[in-house]
Amino acid sequence: MPGAGDGGKAPARWLGTGLLGLFLLPVTLSLEVSVGKATDIYAVNGTEILLPCTFSSCFGFEDLHFRWTYNSSDAFKILIEGTVKNEKSDPKVTLKDDDRITLVGSTKEKMNNISIVLRDLEFSDTGKYTCHVKNPKENNLQHHATIFLQVVDRLEEVDNTVTLIILAVVGGVIGLLILILLIKKLIIFILKKTREKKKECLVSSSGNDNTENGLPGSKAEEKPPSKV
């Protein structure tokens, strides 16, 4: 029967899917390399710039290998290479192509930092800088991240005029609304007090009228006792 055959294949299919998921899980949760949120950075000619790079691994690392490479439209070169023995060791440089480069990272205290500083920038330093990491503990799994550096004459100042105008307008509107609410509350308070005073005056005036007209309950109703 077709139904019986399908019933026998279903468990095998689910088992195969589960095994595939277990096989792919270490890949998705393993080695990661990051250069931060800003992948495009600018620096002034003649200054220095920090090129950040950190890595992480859920399975730890041993004899980890890293390198920084430079790539532009007409050049490619390895800037610096090194290794990290384990989590308790600092990075060790094995190759450096440019004396202007300094490794400033540390892997102690789980920082896993292999950032570099590039000094005395030149316009020719403009290009892509890629941080590569290979972890032998994860079957030589590799990962990388790239920063684009643009060397300029000077950094352009950001014009915040529009932002300041918007903030001023918004602040003015909020202040006006608060002022209107305060005035409204003040008017309501004054009207309430005025009504209370009018009510007191009416009650007092009514009492005086009763007294003058000799109505029951007034002093005019009282008579002196008659003499026998």
Curated annotation (Swiss-Prot):
Q: Which GO terms describe its biological process?
A: AV node cell action potential; cardiac conduction; cardiac muscle cell action potential involved in contraction; cardiac muscle contraction; establishment of localization in cell; membrane depolarization during cardiac muscle cell action potential; neuronal action potential; positive regulation of sodium ion transport
Q: Which disease is it linked to?
A: Long QT syndrome 10: A heart disorder characterized by a prolonged QT interval on the ECG and polymorphic ventricular arrhythmias. They cause syncope and sudden death in response to exercise or emotional stress, and can present with a sentinel event of sudden cardiac death in infancy.
Output compositional bias ranges, type Basic and acidic residues. Answer: 219-228
Q: Where is the signal peptide?
A: 1-30
Pfam families in UniProt: V-set
Q: How is it modified after translation?
A: Contains an interchain disulfide bond with SCN2A.
Localization: Cell membrane
Q: List the disulfide bonds.
A: C53-C131
- What is the protein named? Sodium channel regulatory subunit beta-4
Q: Which residues are glycosylated?
A: N45, N71, N113
* GO CC, one annotated term: plasma membrane
The record describes the protein's role as: Regulatory subunit of multiple voltage-gated sodium (Nav) channels directly mediating the depolarization of excitable membranes. Navs, also called VGSCs (voltage-gated sodium channels) or VDSCs (voltage-dependent sodium channels), operate by switching between closed and open conformations depending on the voltage difference across the membrane. In the open conformation they allow Na(+) ions to selectively pass through the pore, along their electrochemical gradient.
Family of the protein in this entry: Belongs to the sodium channel auxiliary subunit SCN4B (TC 8.A.17) family.
Q: Which gene encodes it?
A: SCN4B
User: How does this polypeptide assemble, per the annotation?
Assistant: A voltage-gated sodium (Nav) channel consists of an ion-conducting pore-forming alpha subunit functional on its own that is regulated by one or more beta subunits. The beta subunit SCN4B is disulfide-linked to the pore-forming alpha subunit. Interacts with SCN1A; regulatory subunit of SCN1A/Nav1.1. Interacts with SCN2A; regulatory subunit of SCN2A/Nav1.2.
Which superkingdom does the taxonomy of this entry point to? Eukaryota
Q: How does it sit in the membrane?
A: Single-pass type I membrane protein
